[in-house]
Amino acid sequence: MSNGSIPVDEVIEHLRNWNFTWNIILTILLVVLQYGHYKYSVFLYGVKMAILWILWPLVLALSLFDAWASFQVNWVFFAFSILMACITLMLWIMYFVNSIRLWRRTHSWWSFNPETDALLTTSVMGRQVCIPVLGAPTGVTLTLLSGTLLVEGYKVATGVQVSQLPNFVTVAKATTTIVYGRVGRSVNASSGTGWAFYVRSKHGDYSAVSNPSAVLTDSEKVPHLV
């Protein structure tokens, strides 16, 4: 073998270690992406959110570094690096703008969840409940099981009475708030079990948070401007 060449055994060993390292990283990433849901594991969900939040500044930093390294060396790479940096920065700014607009409507830190741009909100036993949803659904179902209230499958409260089911729920987006009015329910008061169904009734520039200080009827609590 000529001088300066790398032994084949050493190359194979490096490839084996590199492959093993990436195998661990990708396996962890697969578990986090598949089970990183708030209903399954709060810890994995937190890790998943941290990864998503880190990606924006990391990609922006890599794009700027590539632009610096390619300057006066490869103008094509330099142009693409600047383009990717601009796209990443624009997406990052749009995320914060929409998240802040959504927070103004809901006053919930779920507004900064990068997975969704819609939050379902309602008031249960005097407590505001806010849940991230993938989008504004056609209808919303609240389920009551022996006094335990489930909103879109999320357990949000216990000891709830049938009479305490809300008359409306809202789904807030960055640009609008959709009000869902209750159109039907089927409940068993003795066992505290049943369901209530809500459909869209109106939308507009409303706050999704009920105003506890105002003297308003249940049907008027939501429609006050942000």
From Swiss-Prot:
Keyword Transit peptide applies:
no
Q: Which Pfam families match?
A: CoV_M (PF01635)
**Per the record, what ranges lie on the membrane's Virion surface side?**
1-11, 63-75
Q: Region Interaction with N protein: which residues?
A: 200-216
Instruction: Give the GO molecular function terms.
Output: structural constituent of virion
Q: What does this protein do?
A: Component of the viral envelope that plays a central role in virus morphogenesis and assembly via its interactions with other viral proteins.
* Protein name, as recorded: Membrane protein
Gene name as annotated: M
